[in-house]
Amino acid sequence: MDAAVEKIAILDFEASSLSEASWPIEIGLSWLEHGEVRTWSSLIHPAHDWEIDDWSPQSAAVHGISMSELTEAPSATEVAETFFKVLGGRRLVSDAPEFEIRWLDRLLRAAGRAENPSIEDFDGTSFAVFDGYALDLVYETIERRPAPHRAGPDTARLARGWLKASQHQAFLELEGRTA
């Protein structure tokens, strides 16, 4: 198992819409630990200062999360606390960091948190960690699984690509070969 990827968590959000005023409705993290994909996700109860009018029926049709499901969800403060516990110092990556940074910032501000973790690009990180056939395995594994558009399963899908590539690299190391 490549130790570099065990120090990284993949982040994804589902959101009220894709507009500038959008807010996070679900967060997901996946990471590799002891040769397995681990995943945590949570719905997010809308904060009082988030614009409820920004709810998009088109986005809801994609992720399948209803506004009524969010009324019973944990608060932004609870979700942020759990997020940092689960993150445990890992670096963050995402396949859409330009969106995730905005939604992470909204979540943390609503929770009164001052932290502002950076989010690296999934593709750039994949190319930095893997090469050759292992890199091919990352993307072949991802392409074979359609994105479910739910935060936890979406991050798990990407992490499975890294797991497959890491297993290949570990096999080559046992054989005394390189990628």
Predicted regions mapped to residue ranges:
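Conserved non-catalytic scaffold segment of RNase H-like nuclease domains
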Residues: D2-F99, E143-R145
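Active-site-proximal helix-loop-helix substrate-binding element of RNase H-like nuclease domains
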Residues: P46-A47, D54-A60, M67-L70, F122-R160
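Acidic, Mg2+-coordinating catalytic module of metal-dependent nucleases/exonucleases
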Residues: R91-E98, R102-L108, D136-A179
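Generic secondary-structure boundary signal with a strong preference for alpha-helix termini
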Residues: A76, G112, A165-S166
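A short alpha->loop->secondary-structure connector
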Residues: L108-F122
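Short, glycine/charged-enriched secondary-structure capping and boundary segments
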Residues: W23-E26, R106-A110
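Short alpha-helical "patches" and their helix-cap loops
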Residues: S42-P46, P117-D121, L172-A179
